[in-house]
UniProtKB/Swiss-Prot annotation:
Its EC number is 3.2.2.-. The lineage of its organism: Eukaryota, Viridiplantae, Streptophyta, Embryophyta, Tracheophyta. [4Fe-4S] cluster binds at C1492, C1499, C1502, C1508. GO terms for biological process: base-excision repair; chromosomal 5-methylcytosine DNA demethylation, direct 5-methylcytosine excision pathway. It is found in: Nucleus. This is Protein ROS1C. SMART domains: ENDO3c, FES. It comes from Oryza sativa subsp. japonica. Disruption phenotype: Increased number of wrinkled seeds. Hypermethylation of cytosine residues in the DNA sequence of Tos17 retrotransposons.
Length: 1858
C-alpha cells in the first residue's frame, strides 16, 4: 500500500484479456491498521483510442457509455460501455465485505505481482446520485503500445476511518495518493465532489472549487465514495443494483480468487508481449524515463533510471495471505512493468501523427537537456531509490492542448482539462502536442520542506535555456493553480505560453521596478553550496518554486522565481498576466515592448539560440541570457544577491538596502565580456554601466524621478502587503478596466518605450473570513497614472505605487492578527502563506508613550512656528486652563529647585566664557555619551588645537597660515575693496600701529536722492608697524594699476550730503574666505571732513578671537549709540562701501567694552581664509593684526560689570566702573570728527576718547531716534531684544504671534542663511567680540587639519571618526556661507531664526539646539535630554499612557521619546524666565546623575521620593506584594530584592522593618530562628584618633549650616495610594486604606542589595583647602583662580605608608632594631614611614578647580562639570611635591570623593552623605596636565577603577576578604 499524511485513494491499473471477470458480491473486509480497503474492478472491453479521445468534447464520450442507475444512497454507479453491450455480463463490482476471493486477490497484490507504481492511465467514472447526471467516461489517453490490449481497471478505493494513515514500506515506490476529501463523514458516507480531472489529480480537497467545473460544464462532478454501513449491492446485467445475499457471497468466494489470478497472469503476459514488440522498434529507449518529481523540475527533463531490485510491498499489519497467486507471477517485477509502460507512453507520443483526430505538429525532437558546468565535470544523476524519496510527494498534472495552428497568434485553443501524472512513479503520459505544464504547490508541512531539498537545489542550477521562437504563439490559454495549505488557492488563468509567473514568490512584484536589460551574457557556472545559496532553510525553500513552460523545438523555458523575471518578445505583442482566484481577485498585467532594434522586420530582435558552450548559472536568483530586450522586475537588493551568490565579495560601504532604487539600465551588448567581470564587488558590477544611476532614499521620503533614463514605480516595501491582505476574498463586484495606454511621448525612441496595461478583475464571490477594503479600485486609479515611461528623459510627474496604502502596515500591526491563510511578504519580496506569527524582533520591550492631548499639540505647533494662531487663542476657558497648568508647573519647578538646593547646593546661573561655535561643537561631543567623557573629549580637542597656534612671520617668509589676502571685487557699479590681515593672535598688552594711506578720496553725490560714490581711490598701500619697530609693507593693485604710495601722512575723506534720505555705506573687510562686513548709515547733513595737515591717524586695537568681526557704526541724525535698538533701512547703492563714525557724544572719556555697547571699531582677528571675491592679492605680513581708519583709539582698564543682566534700553547711561556713556539727542550738531586712540591695558579694556583737537568738532543734525531712556520699544520687547544681551522678554515672547513659515522651509538648501547675519550686522550697532566670548579652540586650525588628527584627539569619547567629520563640515559651512568661523551674530537675531539656523546644521537635533539656545544664547528654551525625560516621567510631570498589566512603572526600561516629552513640557514652561529654566535644567542634570539614574536609582536617599511615582511603584511592589510580571528572568533571592534589575522581587524573601503605627504589626514576624545576641562594638584606636583630629582641625566648621531634608509623608501616602489604584484595579478602597499606614522617614524605603566592593566605586581622601593668599600658591606659580569659581585650590597629602609607584601593600625589608637606625632603601616601608614622620615636610598633590583649570571658558556654560568638581594635577600626582608641615597647620580640611564618574561616586550614599559631599566636599574624576591643559586619567594612588585592577590585586583582595 502507500503511506501519506492524508491518503484517501489508491489506484492501480491492470492489463488483462477480454475475458470477463465475474466478481462475487460477498463483501471483503480487509483489516488494516489505519483504515479499510474497498476494491472495485471494472472491465473495459474493446477499448480503442477513438473512444478515449482526450481532445474531443467530453459530451461526445458520454454517448458511448451506458448510464448507470443509482440504487441506494452513496452507491457508486459504474457505467458500462457500448462496446460490451453485446456481452452477457457487464463489469462487476466488489464491495467491502467480500471474504475469500477478495482476500486471494489482495494476496496476489501483496506478493509483488501487481505493478503498483506507474500503471495509471484512467479512472472509474461515476455519477452523483444527488445530481442524477449520467456518468462521464474519463478522458485520458492510453500509451500507444497498449492500444490493442484490452484494459481492465482495478481501483483500490481507501476510505479513511479517522485513525490516521497507513505506513508505507520503505521499499515502496508507489505514487502519492490524493488527499482526503473534506466534508466526508462516516455517518452518511457520501464523499464530496472530486475535481474535474481524475483520481490522480494533484489537488487536495481544498482545491475543489466551482470554478474548476466551470471550465468544462459538460463534465459534472462525480463522486465515488461508498459507505460500508449499507448492504452490499450487486450490479445486475440490466444495470440495476440489488442486494446480494450472504449465502451467495460465500459460494462465489472461491471463484473470485481464481478469476483474479487469471486476470493478473493474463494481463501480465499480454503486456510483456506488447512491450517486447515495442522494444524491438525502439531499443535505445527501452529503459524507462521518469520525470523528476521535484517541485522545481521541468517535467520534460528525464533521467535514466536504473532498474531496481525486486520490491515487495508489505503491510504494517502482518496478514497471512495465500501464496497461490504469488507463484504465477513471480518472474515479473515492478520495475520491469514500470519501464515498459514508460516506453509505451513514449512510443505513443512518437506516433502522434497517426492519430487522425490530432492534427498537430508531428515533429518532436527528443532532447535531454543537461547543465554542463565549467568548474566541475557534469554530475551524473543517480537513480533515486524509494529511501531517498520523501513521503508526501504529489503527482504532477498533465496539460494537453488541442490541435492548433502554431503560426497563428489570434486563434487559441479551447480550455483543456487537467490530466494527472504520477510524480511518484516517475511516468508521464505525453502526447504530441506542444506543452505539458505542471502545477505549483505549497507544501509547508514537515515532509514538504524536507522533500528533496537537494533535488530542488540541483535542478535550480542545472536548468539550461532553450531557444525561443519569436513566432511562437503567446495566446494559448492555460491555467495554473497554486495550492495553499489551508484551502486557499491562487489561479493564474489565461496566461500566455511564454509568460509564467510564480505566484508563490513574486505576485506582488509585477509593478515593483522595471529594469531594461539588453543582451546580458551568462555568468560562468559555479557550484554553490546550499548554505551560500540560501536553499537550506525552510523559509527560503518555500520561495524557490518556479514555473517552466516549454514551447516548440525552438522555444525556451522561462523561469519566474522570486525575482519575478518576465521575458517578452515580438512586435507589439501584449503579454497578459491573469492572476485569478475564485474567492479572490484577478489581476491582468500587460507589458508591451515596441520595436527596439530591428525595425525593418517589424519585430524585436529574436532571441538567439543558446550556444552550447554558454552555460546558464543560477545563483539563487533567476537570470536571463541571450535576449536583446527584456523586462526584469526585481529590486536592487535581489540583483546584489546574484553577485553575492557568484562568490563576489560585497563591500560594506557599498551596501544597497531593499528600499534603494535601481534605475533602468542598459548593459553592454557584447555578451562575451560578462564573464571577465566576475572578481568585482557587487556595487562595482552595478556601477559598471554608464546608464546606471543609484539614488538613495530617506525613510521619510518617497521616490523621485529625478534622473534621466530611469523609471521608478515605487512600491513601498513595508506597506506592500499588510497582515490582513488575503488574496482570496474580501472583494465584491466584478470590475475590469479595458483602458490601455499606447501613447508615448514624442521624444521617446522606439527602442526604449514601454506601455504598461493593468486590468483588475474582482470576482463576485467573497470570502466570509476577510474584510479587506476595495483593493483593486485603488490599484486601478494608481495604474492609470502609469502612462508614459520614458527610459531616456526625465519625467515631470512622479509615479508612486503603493499596493496596500489603504491597508494597515505590517510593521504598524506588530505582526498580529494574521489570518490563517493570509499571504504575507517575506524576504526578497516573496509571498508565502502565513503559518505562525511573525516575530519582527526577538523580544520587543514595551516603550512608554506620552499621553498628549489635542490642546497641547496645538500649542506646541504654535510655539514651533507651525501655525499662525496666537498661543493662547481666543477661548477664555482655554486661556484660563493654560494659566492654571502653567502655575502648576511653575510651582513644581520652584519646589524641585528649592529641594535640590538643599542637597546639591546653589546652581544659579553664573556665566562662563566661550563662543557660540564652542557650544555648537560641544553639543556635537555630548550626544549619546556621559558628560565626563564628552567634557574630556572637548578638553583634549582644545589641548590639541590651542588658540594662537598659527605661527608668526619669520624672516619675512609668509606661509599658508599667515598669508594676508587683500581682495578687491566689483559688482556692477559697486566696487568693494576688502582688506584683511592674517597673523598670530597677539596677547593682550601688545601695541601695534597700523596706518592706511590712500590717494585722496572724494565722496560727492551724483544727485540728491542717490547714494554717494567714491570717485577715486585706485591705489592704496597698507603698512603695519609693530611696537618693536618692524615694518611690513603691503601694496595692492586695484584695476590692474600698481603704484607705490610714500605719503602716509594724511587721509582725506570728504562726505557731502545734501539730502534727507538715509544713505548706507558698507565696508567689507575680508581675508581669504572670510568677509567681515560693517554697514554704516550716513544720515544727511552730516559732513565728515579731515584736513590734509592732520597727523597720521594711528590706533592700536584689541583683538577678537574669531576669524571675522563686524566693523562699522551707525550714522543717524541726532542719534546716539543705542546698541540693539537701532534699526536701519537697507537701500540699494552703487559705489565703494565706506565706513564712517557714529554721531554720539561721550561725556566720560571712555566706552566700556564689557557692556553691551558696540565699539566704534572692532579689532580684527583673522586667519588664512580663501577669498570669496574676484581679485585678491597676497601680502606677507603676519604681524599685521590691527586694521586702522581715520581715528585713534585708546584702550584702558575698566572695572568689570557688576550687574549681569543690565538692560541697555532701560538705561541709556550705563555705568561700568567709573566710566559712563550717555547719549546726546541734540539736533544742532552739524559735523563730527572723532579721533580716538586705542590702547591695551591689561585683561580688561575699554575705549577711551582722546583729546579733541581745535579744528575737530562733533556735529549732529536732527534727532530721529525716540526717547528710550525709560522703557524699550514695544516692538523690540516683542521681538525678544529688550535686554542688551539678546535675552527676550518672557511675557512679550509668549504673546508674540509666531511666524507661519515652517522650519522645514527655512532649512531648505536654497535659503540664504547669511541674510540673518547681514540683518544682525546692519540693524544693530556693530559689536566687538569681547574677551569673555572668545574662542577656546583654534577652529581655523581644526578646519584645516586632517580628520584623523581630530578623530585621534577625541578618540576616548567614542564615535570619533563620525564626529570629527561632522565638526569639520560644520566649520567649512561657516566659512562657505558666512565667510568666517563666527556665530556670535546669533545672539542678535530673533530666537526663532536662531533656532531654525541651528536646526539646519547637520547633526544637531532639537535637544542639542535647545541646549545651545538656553545655555549659550540665553534664550527661553528647555532642552529635554535623557536625564530630564526620565525624571519628568518618574515624578509624574508627564502623563504616560497606561502600561501593560504585567509591567510596573519601576520596571520600565524604555521611556518615551524625548521629543514627545518636550512637546508636553514646553507649552507649560514657556512662561518661566531664563534663570529659572537654566537652574531647573542644571539641577535636573545633576539629579539624574546622583539620584535618579537609569538603572538602580538611589531611591532611599532621594529627596523627591514622596512625589515620585517610580518609588511608589517600587515600594508597593516590595512592601505590599503587588503582582509581578511573568518573566523568565525571575530568580529566587534569599536575602535581597532585585526589582531594580528589571524583575519583580519575591515579597517574603527578606524580613522587612516594622512600619510604625501598623495595625497589622502584631501579625508580622520575621522567619529568623537564630538567637539575637547584642554585643557592643569594640572601639578602635584609629577612629578615636580620627575623631580627635576632626575636632581640632574642624573646630570652626558649623555643621548646622547643612539643612535637614524631611520627607513629606502626606504626599507620599497620596502618591502611593494612586499608584496602587493604577496597578491593581481589583483592590477595593478599604483594602488600600488598610494597606496605607502612617510611614515614617525610616520606614519609607525599599530593600536594596548591599553594595560590594564600595572601594571600587569611590575613594575618599582628606585634603587641605588652599586660600588664594597662601604662600604655596606663589611658590607653585599656580594660575589665578577665576573670580566666579566657587571651589578653591586643594592639596591632597600622601600618608607615610603610601608609596608613589606601587599598588601593593608595602613590605618591610630591614629590621631597624637590629641595625640600630633607618636604612636608605626607599622601598623599605618601615624606614620610609618613620623617616617621613620625623621629617618636617610632607608630600602632596595639587587639586585644581575645574573652572580655573579651564580658565572659565567651556561650552554650554560649563554644565558638563559639577560646581564642586576638581582636577588632580597630573605632574604632582606622579611626582608629589614637598610641603612644609607648618604651612598646613591652620588650613581647613575637606573630603574629596575620587571615582570614574559622578554616578558611580554617589551610588549607595545616603542623603546626608550626598549633602555633605556637595556642601563640604568635592568630587574628582580626572587628572589634568596644567602645561598642555589636556585631561589625563586619575593616578591609581587616588582611585583605581575596577576595570584596571590587576589579576594579582584581585586575588589578594579575595584572600583578604576570606
Amino acid at each position: 500500500m502507500a503511506k501519506d499524511e492524508n491518503p484517501s485513494y489508491l489506484h492501480l491499473i491492470f492489463l488483462s484479456s477480454r475475458i470477463r471477470v465475474f466478481i462475487l458480491d460477498p463483501p471483503l473486509s480487509l483489516p488494516l491498521s489505519h483504515g479499510q480497503c474497498e476494491l472495485q474492478v471494472v472491465e473495459e472491453a474493446a477499448m480503442d483510442p477513438s473512444g478515449l479521445n482526450l481532445q474531443g468534447n467530453p459530451a461526445e464520450n458520454q454517448e458511448s457509455w451506458t448510464s448507470g442507475v443509482s440504487v441506494g444512497r452513496g452507491t457508486p454507479n459504474l457505467g458500462v460501455g457500448t462496446a460490451v453491450a453485446g456481452r452477457s455480463c457487464p463489469s462487476s463490482t466488489l464491495f467491502p465485505g467480500s471474504s475469500l476471493s477478495s482476500t486471494a486477490l489482495l494476496n496476489t497484490m501483496h506478493e509483488g505481482s501487481f505493478p503498483q507504481t506507474a500503471l495509471v492511465a484512467g479512472s472509474v467514472s461515476s455519477a452523483d446520485e444527488q445530481h442524477g447526471a449520467p456518468p462521464v467516461r474519463p478522458s485520458y489517453n492510453l500509451p500507444a503500445g497498449c492500444t490493442q490490449v484490452p484494459i481492465s481497471i482495478l481501483v483500490f478505493h481507501r476510505r479513511l476511518t479517522g485513525r490516521g494513515s497507513r505506513c508505507r514500506s520503505p521499499q515502496s515506490r508507489s505514487f502519492m495518493p490524493a488527499p482526503a476529501l473534506s466534508g466526508v463523514s462516516e455517518a452518511d458516507g457520501a464523499y464530496g465532489p472530486i475535481p474535474q480531472s481524475d483520481f490522480l489529480s494533484l489537488r487536495g480537497p481544498s482545491e475543489v472549487f466551482p470554478g474548476d467545473m466551470a471550465m468544462n460544464h459538460s463534465e459534472p462532478a462525480t463522486s465515488y465514495g461508498y459507505n460500508s454501513e449499507y448492504a452490499p449491492m450487486h450490479l445486475q446485467p440490466n444495470g440495476l443494483y440489488t442486494e446480494a445475499s450472504n449465502t451467495e457471497s460465500e459460494r462465489e468466494a472461491s471463484q473470485l480468487q481464481q478469476s483474479a489470478e487469471a486476470v493478473i497472469c493474463d494481463s501480465l503476459s499480454k503486456l510483456e508481449s506488447a512491450m517486447e514488440k515495442i522494444q524491438g522498434q525502439n531499443p535505445q529507449e527501452s529503459s524507462g524515463l521518469v520525470a523528476e518529481g521535484s517541485a522545481d523540475d521541468n517535467i520534460h527533463k528525464y533521467h535514466q533510471k536504473a532498474k531496481r531490485a525486486r520490491t515487495q510491498i508489505t503491510h504494517s499489519d502482518k496478514i497471512d495471505l495465500p501464496t497461490q497467486a504469488v507463484s504465477a507471477c513471480k518472474e515479473k517485477t515492478i520495475t520491469q512493468i514500470e519501464m515498459q509502460i514508460a516506453d509505451a507512453e513514449r512510443t505513443e507520443a512518437l506516433k502522434g501523427e497517426d492519430a487522425p483526430a490530432q492534427k498537430l505538429k508531428t515533429r518532436r525532437r527528443k532532447h535531454r537537456p543537461k547543465v554542463i558546468r565549467e568548474d566541475r565535470p557534469a554530475k551524473k544523476q543517480m537513480a533515486t531509490t524509494s529511501e531517498e524519496k520523501p513521503l508526501n510527494q504529489k503527482p504532477k498534472r498533465k496539460y494537453v492542448r488541442k490541435n492548433r495552428n502554431p503560426s497563428s497568434l489570434e486563434k487559441c485553443a479551447e480550455p483543456f482539462s487537467d490530466h494527472s501524472i504520477s510524480r511518484e512513479s516517475r511516468t508521464t503520459v505525453r502526447s504530441s502536442i506542444a506543452s505539458v505544464r505542471r502545477r505549483l504547490q505549497f507544501e509547508f508541512g514537515e515532509h514538504g520542506v524536507q522533500r528533496d531539498q537537494s533535488s530542488m537545489t540541483n535542478s535550480w542550477y542545472q536548468n539550461q535555456e532553450k531557444p525561443v521562437n519569436a513566432e511562437s504563439s503567446l495566446c494559448s490559454v492555460t491555467k495554473s493553480s497554486v495550492q495553499v495549505e489551508h484551502g486557499q488557492e491562487l489561479h493564474m488563468e489565461n496566461s500566455p505560453e511564454g509568460l509564467f509567473f510564480g505566484i508563490n514568490s513574486k505576485l506582488n512584484k509585477i509593478l515593483d521596478e522595471y529594469i531594461h536589460l539588453p543582451e546580458a551574457a551568462p555568468k560562468p557556472s559555479e557550484q554553490i553550496p546550499l548554505a551560500a545559496s540560501g536553499h537550506v532553510s525552510e523559509e527560503l525553500a518555500r520561495k524557490q518554486y518556479d514555473v517552466r513552460h516549454t514551447h516548440d523545438p525552438d522555444s525556451t523555458s522561462y523561469n519566474i522565481e522570486r525575482s519575478g523575471l518576465i521575458t517578452t518578445k515580438g512586435h507589439k505583442k501584449d503579454l497578459d498576466l491573469n492572476y485569478s482566484n475564485t474567492n479572490g481577485f484577478q489581476m491582468y498585467c500587460s507589458a508591451s515592448l515596441l520595436p527596439e532594434m530591428d525595425s525593418t522586420k517589424g519585430s524585436m530582435t529574436k532571441v538567439s539560440k543558446m550556444d552550447k558552450n554558454k552555460k546558464r548559472h543560477y545563483g539563487g536568483e533567476s537570470s536571463l541570457a541571450g535576449t536583446q530586450s527584456s523586462i526584469i522586475m526585481r529590486t536592487a537588493a535581489e540583483m546584489l544577491a546574484v553577485y553575492q551568490a557568484c562568490g563576489i565579495k560585497k563591500k560594506r560601504s557599498a551596501r544597497v538596502r531593499r528600499n534603494s532604487f535601481l534605475s533602468v539600465m542598459d548593459l553592454e551588448k557584447n555578451t562575451s565580456q560578462e564573464s571577465t567581470r566576475l572578481p568585482r564587488s557587487c556595487m562595482e558590477a552595478l556601477y559598471e554601466s554608464s546608464y546606471i544611476k543609484f539614488m538613495t532614499k530617506k525613510r521619510s521620503q518617497k521616490a523621485r524621478l529625478n534622473s534621466p533614463n530611469s523609471i521608478q514605480p515605487n512600491i513601498d516595501q513595508k506597506n506592500r502587503f499588510s497582515s490582513e491582505t488575503v488574496f482570496s476574498g474580501g472583494f465584491n463586484g466584478l470590475k475590469r478596466s479595458e483602458e490601455t495606454f499606447q501613447k508615448t511621448l514624442p521624444q521617446i525612441p522606439d527602442d526604449k518605450r514601454i506601455n504598461l496595461d493593468i486590468h483588475c478583475k474582482v470576482p463576485v464571490e467573497s470570502s466570509p473570513n476577510t474584510s479587506t477594503p476595495p483593493y483593486m479600485d485603488y490599484l486601478q486609479g494608481v495604474t492609470s497614472k502609469f502612462r508614459y515611461f520614458d527610459l531616456n528623459t526625465e519625467q515631470v510627474h512622479k509615479t508612486e505605487m503603493h499596493l496596500s496604502q489603504t491597508m494597515p502596515s505590517l510593521s504598524s500591526l506588530g505582526a498580529t492578527n494574521y489570518l490563517p491563510n493570509a499571504l504575507v511578504p517575506y524576504v526578497g519580496g516573496a509571498v508565502v502563506p502565513y503559518q505562525t506569527q511573525f516575530h519582527l524582533v526577538k523580544k520587543q520591550r514595551p516603550r512608554a508613550k506620552v499621553d498628549l492631548d489635542f490642546e497641547t499639540t496645538r500649542v506646541w505647533n504654535l510655539l514651533m512656528g507651525k501655525a499662525a494662531d496666537p498661543v493662547d487663542g481666543t477661548d477664555v476657558d482655554k486661556e484660563r486652563w493654560w494659566k492654571q497648568e502653567r502655575e502648576v508647573f511653575q510651582g513644581r519647578a520652584n519646589s524641585f529647585i528649592a529641594r535640590m538646593r538643599l542637597v546639591q547646593g546653589d546652581r544659579r546661573f553664573s556665566p562662563w566664557k566661550g563662543s557660540v561655535v564652542d557650544s555648537v561643537v560641544g553639543v556635537f561631543l555630548t550626544q549619546n555619551v556621559a558628560d565626563h567623557l564628552s567634557s574630556s573629549a572637548y578638553m583634549a580637542l582644545a589641548a590639541s588645537f590651542p588658540t594662537g597656534s598659527h605661527g608668526n612671520c619669520n624672516d619675512g617668509i609668509a606661509g599658508q597660515d599667515n598669508e594676508e589676502i587683500i581682495s578687491t571685487s566689483a559688482v556692477g557699479d559697486r566696487g568693494t575693496f576688502e582688506f584683511f590681515y592674517n597673523g598670530s593672535r597677539p596677547d593682550i598688552g601688545l601695541n601695534f600701529e597700523f596706518s592706511m594711506a590712500c590717494e585722496k578720496i572724494h565722496m560727492e553725490p551724483k544727485d540728491n536722492t542717490t547714494v554717494n560714490e567714491l570717485t577715486k581711490g585706485e591705489n592704496y598701500s597698507l603698512h603695519c608697524k609693530e611696537s618693536a619697530g618692524s615694518l611690513c609693507d603691503h601694496e595692492t593693485e586695484i584695476d590692474h594699476k600698481a603704484k607705490s604710495i610714500s605719503d602716509f601722512s594724511a587721509v582725506e575723506l570728504t562726505a557731502c550730503m545734501k539730502n534727507l534720505h538715509a544713505t548706507q555705506f558698507q565696508k567689507e573687510i575680508s581675508l581669504s574666505q572670510s568677509v567681515v562686513t560693517s554697514e554704516s548709515i550716513l544720515q544727511p547733513g552730516l559732513p565728515l571732513s579731515s584736513g590734509m595737515d592732520h597727523a597720521r591717524r594711528n590706533f592700536v586695537g584689541s583683538i577678537s578671537d574669531t576669524a571675522s568681526q563686524q566693523v562699522g557704526s551707525n550714522f543717524d541724525d541726532g542719534k546716539s549709540l543705542t546698541g540693539n535698538d537701532v534699526t536701519a533701512n537697507e537701500t540699494e547703492y552703487h559705489g565703494i562701501k565706506a565706513a564712517a563714525t557714529n554721531n554720539y557724544v561721550v561725556d566720560e572719556p571712555g566706552i566700556p567694552s564689557g557692556s553691551s555697547l558696540y565699539p566704534f571699531f572692532s579689532a580684527i582677528d583673522c586667519h588664512q581664509l580663501d577669498g570669496r571675491n574676484d581679485t585678491h592679492v597676497s601680502s606677507t605680513s603676519p604681524n599685521c593684526s590691527i586694521c586702522s581708519a581715520s581715528s585713534n583709539f585708546k584702550i584702558g582698564t575698566i572695572e568689570e560689570n557688576s550687574s549681569l543682566f543690565m538692560p541697555f534700553d532701560a538705561h541709556l547711561a550705563q555705568r561700568n566702573g567709573n566710566m559712563i556713556v550717555d547719549t546726546n539727542l541734540s539736533s544742532a550738531l552739524e559735523s563730527t570728527e572723532l579721533p580716538v586712540k586705542l590702547l591695551h591695558c591689561g585683561k580688561r579694556s575699554c575705549y577711551e576718547a582722546s583729546e579733541f583737537q581745535d579744528h575737530e568738532s562733533l556735529y549732529a543734525t536732527g534727532g530721529v531716534i525716540p526717547e528710550t531712556a525709560t522703557k524699550a520699544d514695544d516692538s523690540t520687547l516683542k521681538s525678544g531684544f529688550a535686554s542688551f544681551n539678546g535675552l527676550p522678554d518672557t511675557a512679550a515672547q509668549a504673546s508674540k504671534p509666531k511666524k507661519s513659515r515652517t522650519t522645514s522651509k527655512k532649512n531648505s538648501e536654497n535659503f540664504d542663511w547669511d541674510k540673518l547675519r547681514r540683518q544682525a550686522c546692519g540693524n544693530y550697532q556693530m559689536k566687538e567680540r569681547i574677551f569673555d566670548r572668545r574662542d577656546s579652540v583654534d577652529w581655523e586650525a581644526v578646519r584645516c587639519a586632517d580628520v584623523q588628527r581630530i578623530s585621534h584627539a577625541i578618540r576616548e569619547r567614542g564615535m570619533n571618526n563620525v564626529l570629527a567629520e561632522r565638526i569639520q563640515k560644520f566649520l567649512n559651512r561657516l566659512v562657505t556661507d558666512h565667510g568666517s568661523i563666527d556665530l556670535e551674530w546669533l545672539r542678535d537675531v530673533p530666537p526663532d531664526s536662531a533656532k531654525d539656523y541651528l536646526l539646519s546644521i547637520r547633526g544637531l537635533g532639537l535637544k542639542s539646539v535647545e541646549c545651545v539656545r538656553l545655555l549659550t544664547l540665553h534664550h527661553l528654551a528647555f532642552p529635554v535630554d535623557t536625564n530630564v525625560g526620565r525624571i519628568c516621567v518618574r515624578l509624574g510631570w508627564v502623563p504616560i499612557q497606561p502600561l501593560p498589566e504585567s509591567l510596573q512603572l519601576h520596571l520600565l526600561e524604555l521611556y518615551p521619546v524625548l521629543e514627545t516629552i518636550q512637546k508636553y513640557l514646553w507649552p507649560r514652561l514657556c512662561k518661566l524666565d531664563q534663570q529659572t529654566l537654566y537652574e531647573l535644567h542644571y539641577q535636573m542634570i545633576t539629579f539624574g546623575k546622583v539620584f535618579c539614574t537609569k538603572s538602580k536609582p538611589n531611591c532611599n536617599a532621594c529627596p523627591m521620593r514622596s512625589e515620585c511615582r517610580h518609588f511608589a511603584s517600587a515600594f508597593a511592589s516590595a512592601r505590599l506584594a503587588l503582582p509581578s510580571p511573568q518573566d523568565k528572568r525571575l530568580v529566587n533571592l534569599s536575602n535581597q530584592f532585585a526589582f531594580h534589575n528589571g524583575t519583580m522581587p519575591t515579597p517574603n524573601s527578606t524580613p522587612l522593618p516594622q512600619l510604625e503605627g501598623s495595625i497589622h504589626a502584631r501579625d508580622v514576624h520575621a522567619n529568623n530562628t537564630n538567637p539575637i545576641i547584642e554585643e557592643p562594638a569594640s572601639p578602635r584606636e584609629e577612629e578615636c584618633r580620627e575623631l580627635l583630629e576632626n575636632d581640632i582641625e574642624d573646630f570652626d566648621e558649623d555643621t548646622d549650616e547643612i539643612p535637614i531634608i524631611k520627607l513629606n509623608m502626606e504626599a507620599f501616602s497620596q502618591n502611593l495610594e494612586n499608584c496602587i489604584k493604577e496597578s491593581n484595579k481589583d483592590f477595593q478602597s478599604d483594602d488600600i486604606t488598610k494597606a496605607l499606614v502612617a510611614i515614617s522617614n525610616e520606614a519609607a524605603s525599599i530593600p536594596v542589595p548591599k553594595l560590594k566592593n564600595v572601594h571600587r566605586l569611590r575613594t575618599e581622601h582628606y585634603v587641605y583647602e588652599l586660600p588664594d593668599s597662601h604662600p604655596l600658591m606663589q611658590q607653585l606659580a599656580l594660575d589665578q583662580r577665576e573670580p566666579d569659581d566657587p571651589s578653591p585650590y586643594l592639596l591632597a597629602i600622601w600618608t607615610p605608608d603610601e608609596l608613589k609607584d606601587t599598588r601593593e601593600a608595602p613590605k618591610p625589608c630591614c629590621n631597624p632594631q637590629t641595625e640600630g637606625g633607618l636604612c636608605s632603601n626607599e622601598m623599605c616601608h618601615n624606614c620610609v614611614s618613620e623617616r617621613e614622620n620625623q621629617y618636617r615636610y610632607v608630600r602632596g598633590t595639587v587639586l585644581v578647580p575645574c573652572r580655573t583649570a579651564m580658565r572659565g571658558s567651556f561650552p554650554l556654560n560649563g554644565t558638563y562639570f559639577q560646581v564642586n568638581e576638581v582636577f588632580a594635577d597630573h605632574s604632582s600626582s606622579h611626582n608629589p611635591i614637598n610641603i612644609p608641615r607648618e604651612q598646613l597647620w591652620n588650613l581647613h580640611r575637606r573630603m574629596v570623593y575620587f571615582g570614574t564618574s559622578v554616578p558611580t561616586i554617589f551610588k549607595g550614599l545616603t542623603t546626608e552623605e550626598i549633602q555633605h559631599c556637595f556642601w563640604r566636599g568635592f568630587v574628582c574624576v580626572r587628572g589634568f596636565n596644567m602645561e598642555t591643559r589636556a585631561p589625563r586619567p586619575l593616578c591609581p594612588h587616588f582611585h583605581l577603577a575596577a576595570s584596571k585592577l590587576r589579576r594579582s590585586s584581585k586575588k589578594a583582595a579575595t584572600e583578604q576578604t576570606h
